[in-house]
Amino acid sequence: MRAARALAALGAAFVLLYAGFVLGQQSAPTDYKLVSEDVLAAIDLAKEIDSVRGRELRLSSAVIAPDGHVGLHSHRGDPTIVYMLSGVLTNHHDDGTTEEFHAGEAFAEYGPRSHWVENRGSAPARFIVANIHHQ
């Protein structure tokens, strides 16, 4: 009888301890709280690529030194979004238009239009590049 009571008391203590542990656990939230999001640039991928086979989603950091450039190219089949971290990047399109992008700004390049970029400034142009790249 004494052993049965001791076993019952031990079992009850275990249940209470386990229940306290379980109740003390915080479950993961399923909502968003105190979050803001601004879409800086977007590309409709269905219009740009037929299949993701042989592709990878890539996020890169890049720097163009003062007086540096990336030569004329297009992003047909390689849609790309650029987010400027610092410096200034001048973007030249094949239609003759030119745009300057500064820290905190973003731009998208896609489709058959060609462009080239240069750093006309005195500081490095630092930026993040996200693209769907051919492997």
Regions found by a protein language model. Give the residues of each.
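A short, N-terminal "cap"/entry segment at the start of jelly-roll beta-barrel domains
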Residues: 3-7, 12-58, 92, 100, ...
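Short histidine-centered beta-strand/loop micro-motifs
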Residues: 49, 70-75, 93, 118-120
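A short beta-loop-beta micro-motif enriched in histidine and acidic residues
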Residues: 52-55, 68-80
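Conserved hydrophobic/aromatic beta-strand scaffold that supports enzyme active sites
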Residues: 59-61, 81, 106-108, 129
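Short acidic-glycine-tyrosine-enriched beta hairpin
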Residues: 64-65, 95-112
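Histidine-centered metal-chelating micro-motifs
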Residues: 69-71, 90, 107, 111-118
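Glycine- and acidic-residue-biased ligand/ion/polar-headgroup-sensing regions
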Residues: 75-95, 105
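Ligand-binding loop in jelly-roll beta-barrel domains
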Residues: 112-135
